[in-house]
Structure formats: structure tokens, C-alpha cells
Amino acid sequence: MRAILITLFLILSVVVAEEAEDAAIVETIDPAKEAGISVATNPAKDHGIGGTGEINDLAEDAGVGISKAIYQTLSGQPEAYESPRFKRFVTHCSSHVAETCSDPMHYEGGIRNPTGLSHCIFDSMKACLANHKASLYDSARSKTLNLKPTKVEYLPVIIQTVKFQTVWKTCSQVSAQSCLSDSDVDASTLGACLLPSFNQCVYPTPPPPPPPPPPDETRR
């Protein structure tokens, strides 16, 4: 089990490093910067992890925190971007995105094709989150409690930032593709489609609970 978790940690470290090219969103929503962490940082290197023996030693001793962080993240722990606090930022900014990207005067007229529209959705959401100083981490609570998270404790936040980036990019493309049915779509129609489409993609409505089982006829 430990070997699997350590392997997942190393894979996620590579994914985090590859997402460094999108550093703008990290500055917008990732509190890791407050703790001096870059998305391009290799957490394994920071903690002195080298060969297999060192990895095993770390997992056995100080590495328990890393393994636990990954285990909690991958075993159903509520994702940071799904927290009610951050969800309010995203849903609020979705209205701004729909208004901006449905106006043909915005984004140099490039929103009349799915690629241009998806870029507009992504960039407008990034700008709105930055304006509202949205963060995946409640820094106000940390200051109130006088907390100073370590790099290991920040690992789940970095992972969730990458996950949110992936969802955000995908939903920008999905909404653009589904709402821009043709180049002559009306601006009001486009805006009315973008808002629910993007929100539903990022925060899908959970399926209804299954119906109760029928009564057992044999007990009558």
C-alpha cells in the first residue's frame, strides 16, 4: 500500500510540474505561493527524496504525512474547488463570463468559433477570480488560528489546483462546443446557454438517490 501511495505521489509531482506553464492561475487561486511553494516545485526533491531506499525510509518515518495527504485526497475527501466558499466565487464569475463571452465585441471578435469562445471563457474566469482574490485555501482562517502550513500540508491544495485547472479547461471547451451551435447564434441565446452549461460542467448535479426497494411480499 505504501509503495502505491509513494508512486502516486511521484506521478502527481510530475503532473504539477507540467502545469507550471499555467502559472497565472496558480497566482490567482493557489495559496502555495504564500508559503513559498511553486507549482513547478518538485515536492519529492524538496523533502530530500532520492533513491528507492530514501523513499521507503520517508514513507516509514517522516513520509507518513505525504502518504496521508495523498490518501485523503484520492479516497473521497471533498475537493477544495468544491467547497461552498470557493464554489460561490466560481458561480458568481460564471455570470461575468457569460456576459463577456456572449458579446461579439469582446475578445477581438474571436468568440464566433468554439476555440476562440473556449479561450474567452477560460481567460474571463481567470480574470474574475483574480479580481475577487479567490483562493482554494482559506487564508483568513489560517491567520485567525495562527497557522503556518508546511509544504507537506499544502500538497493537497496544490493537487486540487491542478485538478481544478483540468476541470476548468475541459468545461470551457465543452461549453463553447455545446453553446456555439453556429456562427450566427444570438448573443442573448449564447449567454443564456453559457451560464448553466459551465456551472453544470464544473459542479454537476449529483444523481438522485435510488428508489427504496419494493416491499417484501413474502413477509405478508
Swiss-Prot record:
InterPro entries membership: Nodulin
Protein keywords: Nodulation, Signal
Gene Ontology terms describing biological process: nodulation
Lineage: Eukaryota, Viridiplantae, Streptophyta, Embryophyta, Tracheophyta
Domain of life: Eukaryota
Expression tissues: Expressed only in infected cells of the nodule.
Keyword Transferase: no
Family according to the record: Belongs to the nodulin 20 family.
Protein name according to UniProt: Nodulin-30
Keyword Signal found: yes
Any one Pfam family match given in the protein's UniProt record, by short name: Nodulin
Gene name of the encoded protein: NPV30
Signal peptide from the UniProt entry: 1-17
